[in-house]
Design a protein with these regions (language model features):
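Short, charged/polar low-complexity linear motifs in solvent-exposed/disordered segments
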Residues: 49-51, 61-64, 216-217
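N-terminal basic, low-complexity leaders that serve as flexible interaction/assembly modules and, when applicable
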Residues: 1-55, 84-88, 94-98, 105, ...
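Active-site loop segments of alpha/beta catalytic cores
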Residues: 37, 68-248
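A short, surface-exposed interaction/processing loop segment used at functional sites
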Residues: 54-73
Length: 248
């Protein structure tokens, strides 16, 4: 048992998007509004500092007219290796901590629990404008592929790929079609470099347990046993005998 220091090993920037941020206080509450100006429209978000978390009052997608600007915003992302701080922290905490990095969320999960839209909004858009949602998904797929080698070549020995997957929202068919291929792609790159890859599966995983078993993931991070979820530790060990369970 030790401290887990979660750190990125790459830097993200958008060279053709102008970002402005305004932060203010109302009593003891701290708010931030961020605007992203693209050639095809301006996007904004509105969040509140919650101390150990962030309360998200507004995300980027507010109407169907925002899809074009969001596509531009996502396509403009550039990634550069940023290994120095991770390497420094790993050396400094060698005796009592480990450093773990991340690829970010899975492409579809980025649209469910990321910064584009809320989970409720995603469910509505998935039913009403699925083609638009999938246009964002395809951009995110290509973006993640640009990150795989950067992370695999970093000092990080083990890396999470996404998580907070909610099977009640997506169901097993969507999970198999839109999640599994990306675990396979990322794992192939990581394993080629002798690195480990896992995912933050902390929810009711029973209906996707067989699919998880078919992934090349090395560990299941934040597995939460029953009664808090619908799988016991014994059931998880039986379902995933070749994977390390990192208990939540």
């Amino acid at each position: 048992m030790c401290i887990v220091n979660r750190m990125s090993v790459f830097h993200t920037h958008r060279p053709h998007v102008l970002t402005r941020q305004h932060t203010w206080w109302e009593g003891r509450r701290r708010f931030t509004r961020t605007e992203h100006e693209t050639p095809v429209g301006t996007l904004s978000s509105f969040v509140e500092d919650g101390g150990f978390t962030t309360w998200r009052h507004e995300l980027l997608l507010k109407s169907p007219e925002d899809y074009a600007a969001i596509r531009y915003f996502l396509k403009d992302e550039r990634y550069e290796p940023d290994y120095a701080e991770f390497d420094r922290a790993q050396r400094a905490g060698a005796d009592d901590s480990i450093c773990r990095s991340s690829f970010g969320l899975e492409p579809l999960q980025e649209l469910i629990s990321g910064n584009v839209m809320s989970m409720e909004h995603f469910c509505e858009e998935w039913m009403e404008r699925r083609d638009e949602v999938l246009s964002l998904y395809e951009i995110l797929v290509e973006n993640r592929r640009k990150i795989y080698s950067i992370v695999a070549e970093s000092p990080a020995g083990h890396v999470n790929y996404g998580g907070n997957v909610t099977p009640e929202i997506i169901g097993p068919k969507v999970f198999e079609k839109y999640y599994l291929p990306h675990y396979h792609e990322a794992a192939e790159v990581m394993h080629r470099h002798g690195k480990l890859i896992g995912c933050h599966f902390d929810a009711n995983n029973r209906i996707i347990a067989d699919a998880i078993a078919r992934t090349p993931l090395d560990y299941i991070e934040a597995f939460t046993p029953a009664p808090d979820t619908d799988m016991t530790l014994a059931e998880a060990r039986a379902a995933w005998p070749d994977k390390v369970l990192w208990i939540n």
